[in-house]
């Protein structure tokens, strides 16, 4: 029935493309008119569009003419005309959708269309790439087109001077990585001067390789951290414990005796669990090595930290392995990105895990980090007014894009028909048999002159295969994190006849593999040679292109690029990315995955079923099974993993939304403090509230005089705020004085002391001092609050055992923590401002200058293990509504946190 309806009215994708094609026809009809314009007239169109937009013409109405202008500029600047399918993709991106375009279809050029159109609004467009190389390359390459049309471009990269960053963000179009955009947002919310902030309001972003950034990286929060307490000695001593504990042969089963051993490893959840016997063994070992006093338990409150350090050491020994999850380089443990195979220099696992791995490897242990600010990519990118993305593989994750980001996926047709042959998987019993078959396939391709790209899942596997190829005397290139610097060069040459390239996962995304090899690199070198005249350069380039044509033809005759996968990935999408490197722009190509029952995916999720099939068929050694049923079984396993990972990301988002709402409130109020001409009225309100709260602690409302602790109040006022008031004498002289009148006198005394300080140093200098003290207090307490939320999240799943909903408990307790933090900020600010002793304006200015200094050193970007918060958390919950922008909340409206209080009595206390 559904298929019949689709035939009659078309799928949603078909209907969208039909609508877009009408606009493409409109754009094409403008081509003769736009082509007739001179370069100056074409460039002047930008200002004309801006004027029309300011006068009320919408960007949607400007689209046909603006796209026609960009197409013409592309012809004049690059000698490249946007295809109609690129126009379709550009329209999808402008409409805030994800455009799925196959590899080699020209996504970079396509993006110029919506980028130019949205830059007309003058609010800044961000183009987000996966690495700094692509950001710089695309900014320089596409920047030529934008400059031709009178628009400015900027690029943001790590370690860039602040003034350059500010200029880059002020440009019409800004290129950068997802990490750098996110970090700059966090840095902006840690600045002490308005002029040091970098970003404008987040208006429109186009995310390149959107699946990699919004799906693969979704569980990786950006964290700015600073050094915390030193536990180096503890990590070294704890590292000796895991080898003394015995691993169980299997996981304990309910209602069965526990297998012999101290702990078991759950590879699916990446966790280690202790048995009852294991706890006893651990206590004996820790007592023996002097970490636990004789007769005391690991579960005593003062030894809980020991338990944490031991579990971290166990995870480091059983779940994290050299040349798989990390490499050791220059006496440092460097994380390897599980999705791209790249080294993630500067990133560190948090919660003590990185230090435990360093202790295991015997390298220098670096200090633990305290979180200063953090945000997930999910929440950062949802802050843009409009978001869109492009990739070659989004369709398998279309549901998640819609559910989490409310982004619809539009599949853009290819410019030329796809002719790549995707062959069935071959499954072998052992890894050795699998690699022998891969070697035979590579040798056959090499002898026939067919280029081969071999995809591996880890650096370890890529180097194992490279060793086998060396033994077989087959020349090859290895592209993994260790050869990152040569990435573009290796990928550019990967299409030459008989070339063999081994790549981890999707290293090299963003650079096309051209059949016959890429001539662009050599053309660039010729252009850079100043010793040659223009005529000589043209002649050499012509010769180069002539030599390339027979190479291109030879590779096509050999079957195009051959893709070999050495393992299936957990996600079908990453398999499709590997396959997508072949068959670009209608080129021939083929692909096949070789698997063994010893591969992690097969072992954990599909091994038993496929092994049973192989045993029934009684296949001889070295003989693979190749059948649609096996491939379907593997895809079912992948769907299970994808579904589980989606549930984890969705649950993480539900937890992080709590912190995100608090972050928005706090950052909004911090920005108000930073931008306000004076915060005197805010400070006065905080001071009066703090005085009243202290007063009511000693003299409760509606209480009789016998219940008043006047002496205690006098002492507290003098000790905490240096307010010397003879309250006892006042009451003796005026017996009829009410508590309200007494409160007014205390408030008036506080105000008088404060006014004297202001007059002593001058209103202007004092206003700046107030601002710096307020900002310092907000930052300090926010850091502590983030640590408190981390601890709360790690143990919250245990509430499930008490028949409570962990998410609801987390929301409730996080709100209580946030309310407590606001109270502490208020008390802290009032105490400092009331008790500070200043002699001159110069002292105040010096204090302000000290506060404005960079107060975060060694900014690091590292993983945080959020899986613990999700453990045992039951079924996935329904999706929460997605809000792109937090609306401005009126002071008397209900607080958006859901407490039921008015905003002014809740999170608006600092506003």
Curated annotation (Swiss-Prot):
Which of this chain's residues are annotated to bind Zn(2+)? 895, 897, 906-907
One Gene Ontology cellular component: plasma membrane
Which GO biological process categories is it annotated with? intracellular protein transmembrane transport; protein import; protein targeting; protein transport by the Sec complex
- Alphabetical UniProt keywords: ATP-binding, Cell inner membrane, Cell membrane, Cytoplasm, Membrane, Metal-binding, Nucleotide-binding, Protein transport, Translocase, Translocation, Transport, Zinc
Binding of ATP, residues: 86, 104-108, 512
Q: Which family does it belong to?
A: Belongs to the SecA family.
Task performed by this protein: Part of the Sec protein translocase complex. Interacts with the SecYEG preprotein conducting channel. Has a central role in coupling the hydrolysis of ATP to the transfer of proteins into and across the cell membrane, serving both as a receptor for the preprotein-SecB complex and as an ATP-driven molecular motor driving the stepwise translocation of polypeptide chains across the membrane.
Q: What is this protein called?
A: Protein translocase subunit SecA
The species is Bordetella pertussis (strain Tohama I / ATCC BAA-589 / NCTC 13251)
């Amino acid at each position: 029935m559904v298929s019949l309806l689709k035939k009659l009215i078309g799928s949603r994708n078909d209907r969208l493309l039909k609508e877009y094609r009408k606009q493409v026809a409109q754009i094409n009809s403008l081509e003769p008119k736009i082509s007739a314009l001179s370069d100056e007239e074409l460039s002047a169109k930008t200002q004309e569009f801006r004027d029309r937009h300011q006068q009320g013409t919408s960007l949607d109405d400007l689209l046909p003419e603006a796209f026609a202008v960009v197409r013409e500029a592309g012809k004049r600047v690059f000698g490249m005309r946007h295809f109609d399918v690129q126009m379709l993709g550009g329209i999808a991106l402008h409409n805030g959708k994800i455009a799925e375009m196959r590899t080699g279809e020209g996504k970079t050029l396509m993006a110029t269309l919506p980028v130019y159109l949205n830059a007309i609004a003058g609010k800044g467009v961000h183009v987000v790439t996966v690495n700094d190389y692509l950001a710089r390359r695309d900014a320089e390459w596409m920047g030529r087109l934008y400059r031709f049309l009178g628009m400015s471009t900027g690029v943001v990269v790590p370690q860039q001077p602040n003034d350059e960053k500010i200029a880059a963000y002020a440009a019409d179009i800004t290129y950068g990585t997802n990490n750098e955009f996110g970090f700059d947002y966090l840095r902006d919310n840690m600045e002490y001067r308005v002029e040091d902030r970098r970003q404008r309001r987040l208006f429109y972003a186009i995310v390149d390789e959107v699946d990699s950034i919004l799906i693969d990286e979704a569980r990786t929060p950006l964290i700015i951290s600073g050094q915390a307490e030193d536990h180096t000695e503890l990590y070294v001593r704890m590292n000796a414990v895991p080898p003394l504990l015995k691993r169980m042969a299997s996981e304990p089963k309910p209602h069965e005796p526990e297998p012999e051993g101290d702990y078991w490893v759950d590879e699916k959840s990446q966790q280690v669990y202790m048995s009852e016997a294991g706890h006893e063994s651990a206590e004996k070992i820790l007592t023996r090595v002097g970490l636990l006093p004789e007769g005391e338990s690991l579960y005593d409150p003062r030894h809980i930290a020991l338990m944490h350090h031991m579990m971290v050491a166990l995870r480091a020994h059983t779940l994290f392995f050299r040349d798989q999850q990390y490499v050791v380089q220059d006496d440092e443990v460097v994380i390897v990105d599980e999705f791209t195979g790249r080294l993630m220099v500067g990133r560190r696992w948090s919660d003590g895990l990185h230090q435990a791995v360093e202790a295991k490897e015997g390298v220098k242990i670096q200090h633990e980090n305290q979180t200063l600010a953090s945000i997930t990519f999910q929440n950062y990118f949802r802050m843009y007014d409009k978001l869109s993305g492009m990739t070659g593989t989004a369709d398998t994750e279309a549901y998640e894009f819609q559910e989490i980001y409310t982004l619809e996926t539009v599949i853009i047709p290819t410019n030329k028909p796809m002719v790549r042959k995707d062959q069935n998987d071959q499954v072998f019993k052992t890894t050795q048999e699998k690699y022998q078959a891969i070697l035979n396939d590579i040798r056959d391709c090499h002898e026939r002159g067919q280029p081969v790209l071999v995809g591996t899942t880890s650096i370890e596997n890529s180097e194992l295969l490279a060793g086998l190829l060396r033994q077989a005397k087959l020349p090859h290139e290895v592209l993994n994190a260790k050869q990152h610097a040569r990435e573009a060069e290796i990928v550019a040459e990967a299409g030459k006849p008989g070339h063999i390239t081994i790549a981890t996962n999707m290293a090299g995304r963003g650079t096309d593999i051209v059949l016959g090899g890429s001539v662009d690199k050599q053309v660039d070198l010729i252009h850079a040679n100043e010793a040659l005249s223009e005529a000589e350069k043209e002649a050499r380039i012509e010769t180069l292109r002539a030599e390339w044509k027979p190479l291109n033809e030879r590779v096509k005759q050999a079957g195009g690029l051959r893709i070999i996968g050495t393992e299936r990935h957990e996600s079908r999408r990453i398999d499709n990315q590997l396959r997508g490197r072949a068959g670009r722009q209608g080129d021939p190509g083929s692909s096949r995955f070789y698997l063994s029952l010893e591969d992690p995916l097969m072992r954990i999720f599909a091994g038993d079923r496929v092994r049973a099939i192989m045993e029934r068929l009684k296949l001889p050694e070295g003989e693979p099974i190749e059948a649609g049923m096996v491939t379907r079984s593997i895809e079912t396993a992948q769907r299970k993993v994808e579904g589980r990972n989606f549930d984890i990301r969705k649950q993480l988002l539900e937890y992080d939304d709590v912190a995100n709402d608090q972050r928005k409130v706090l950052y909004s109020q911090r920005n108000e403090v930073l931008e306000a001409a004076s915060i005197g009225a805010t400070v006065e309100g905080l001071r009066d509230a703090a005085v009243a709260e202290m007063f009511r602690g000693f003299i409760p409302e509606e209480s009789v005089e016998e219940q008043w602790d006047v002496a205690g109040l006098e002492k507290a006022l003098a000790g905490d705020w240096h307010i010397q008031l003879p309250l006892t004498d006042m009451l003796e002289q005026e017996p009829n004085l009410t508590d309200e009148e007494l409160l007014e006198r205390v408030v008036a005394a506080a105000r008088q002391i404060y006014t004297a300080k202001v007059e002593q140093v001058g209103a202007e200098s004092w206003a700046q001092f107030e601002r710096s003290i307020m900002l310092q207090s907000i930052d300090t307490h926010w850091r502590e609050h983030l640590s408190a939320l981390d601890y709360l999240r790690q143990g919250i799943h245990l509430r499930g055992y008490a028949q409570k909903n962990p998410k609801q408990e987390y929301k409730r307790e996080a709100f209580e923590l946030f309310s407590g933090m606001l109270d502490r900020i208020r008390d802290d600010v009032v105490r400092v401002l009331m008790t500070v002793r200043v002699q001159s304006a110069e002292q105040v200015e010096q204090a302000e200058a000290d506060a404005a200094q960079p107060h975060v050193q060694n900014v690091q970007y590292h993983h945080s293990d959020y899986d613990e918060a999700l453990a045992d958390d039951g079924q996935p919950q329904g999706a929460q509504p997605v809000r792109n922008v937090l609306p401005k909340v009126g002071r008397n409206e209900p607080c958006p946190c859901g407490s039921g209080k008015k905003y002014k009595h809740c999170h608006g206390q600092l506003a």
